[in-house]
């Protein structure tokens, strides 16, 4: 049996989300149909507002509704360290652990020749300009995921940054190979920041 077109379109829309297959998308579509109209309208408005009101910080690349973001504006944070992550969600995960009090920089991905993603596709140039302009930075902590692409990106960044005399370290203990920062618990992230190693 074929679903009516509005349901098919809704299922297709849900399937565009990462990790959502046909079965889950169908379940979400029927759940949405069963919701009352006010809740569906509020949900739709939240989606539109997130897309319209959020953008990337012009300094660090984190997601924000103000520019610069709250972290970059916070002068009480340690201005001597910048922790480099793959995605904005990684900033949220690490900051939630409340053990790191420095600045962040979001790459928006990692080097991946297989996917055709090179240095020019990442937020690397702005990091280098930021380091050149901000002489207070003494350490860059690279917190890319423990994947081959994350490791390659960390090594690439270290080669670019070290000649400037800035210490470059990498998150350590507790993050197993192939793991994503997003899914690590707060204690593991705290230990990873504390136990970082120099590259």
Curated annotation (Swiss-Prot):
Residues 80-176 form the Toprim domain. Signal peptide: none annotated. Keywords: DNA damage, DNA recombination, DNA repair, Metal-binding, Zinc, Zinc-finger. PROSITE patterns: RECR, TOPRIM. The keyword Zinc-finger applies. One of its GO terms (molecular function) is DNA binding. A zinc finger (C4-type) spans 57-72. One of its GO terms (biological process) is DNA repair. HAMAP family: RecR (MF_00017). May play a role in DNA repair. It seems to be involved in an RecBC-independent recombinational process of DNA repair. It may act with RecF and RecO. Belongs to the RecR family. This is Recombination protein RecR. It comes from Lacticaseibacillus paracasei (strain ATCC 334 / BCRC 17002 / CCUG 31169 / CIP 107868 / KCTC 3260 / NRRL B-441) (Lactobacillus paracasei).
């Amino acid at each position: 049996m074929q679903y009516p077109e509005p349901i098919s379109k809704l299922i297709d829309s849900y399937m565009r989300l990462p990790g959502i297959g046909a079965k889950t998308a169908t379940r979400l579509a029927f759940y949405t149909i069963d919701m009352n109209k006010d809740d569906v309208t509020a949900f739709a408005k939240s989606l539109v507002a997130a897309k319209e009101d959020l953008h990337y910080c012009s300094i660090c690349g984190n997601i924000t509704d103000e520019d610069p973001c709250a972290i970059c504006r916070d002068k009480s944070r340690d201005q001597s360290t910048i922790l480099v992550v793959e995605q904005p969600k990684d900033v949220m995960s690490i900051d939630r652990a409340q053990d790191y009090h420095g600045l962040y920089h979001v790459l928006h991905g990692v080097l991946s020749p297989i996917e055709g993603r090179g240095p020019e596709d990442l937020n690397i140039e702005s990091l280098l300009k930021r380091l050149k302009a901000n002489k207070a930075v003494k350490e860059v902590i690279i917190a890319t995921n423990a994947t081959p692409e994350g490791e390659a990106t960390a090594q690439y960044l270290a080669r670019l940054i070290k000649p400037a005399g800035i210490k470059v370290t990498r998150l350590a203990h507790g993050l197993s190979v192939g793991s994503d920062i997003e899914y690590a618990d707060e204690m593991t992230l705290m230990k990873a920041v504390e136990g970082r190693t120099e590259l």
